[in-house]
Amino acid sequence: MSCQQSQQQCQPPPKCTPKCPPKCPTPKCPPKCPPKCPPVSSCCSVSSGGCCGSSSGGGCSSGGGGCCLSHHRRHRSHRHRLQSSGCCSQPSGGSSCCGGDSGQHSGGCC
């Protein structure tokens, strides 16, 4: 039995060397998940109003992820709507909706 043990120690198994390849998929990890929130100054281009990414940008007064009227993109929409800086504070379907001067659900939801 001592001979068999010495032979096993002398002969390394061939499965140990190619076990881990030198090339690991590390660069695929960082770009796996894109940022959840868009830039503060960017709003979605909706026909009636855009969605704000933050409460401090785009003239949105509701807290995080509310909808506002894209008053800075008035040249894009030919229809002249009431450009108020107020947002709908009442969530509809888990998200705030854009509205007119009174905050009615007349715009898109985010």
Curated annotation (Swiss-Prot):
Region (Disordered): 1-23, 83-110
Tissue distribution of the protein: Skin-specific. Expression was readily detected in adult trunk skin, adult arm skin, fetal skin, penal skin, vulva, esophagus and tongue. Not expressed in the cervix, rectum, lung, colon, or placenta.
Ranges annotated as spanning the membrane: none
Coiled coil: none
Biased amino acid composition, Pro residues: 11-23
Induction per the UniProt record: By UVB.
Residue spans of biased composition, Low complexity class: 1-10, 83-95
Residue ranges with Gly residues bias: 96-110
Disulfide cross-links: none
Origin: domain of life: Eukaryota
Record's GO cellular component terms: cytosol
Protein's GO biological process: keratinization
Alphabetically ordered keywords of this record: Keratinization
Job of this protein: Precursors of the cornified envelope of the stratum corneum.
Family: Belongs to the LCE family.
Assembly and oligomerization: Interacts with CYSRT1.
Further remark: Belongs to the LCE cluster present on 1q21.
Name by which UniProt lists this protein: Late cornified envelope protein 1A
Organism in which the protein naturally occurs: Homo sapiens
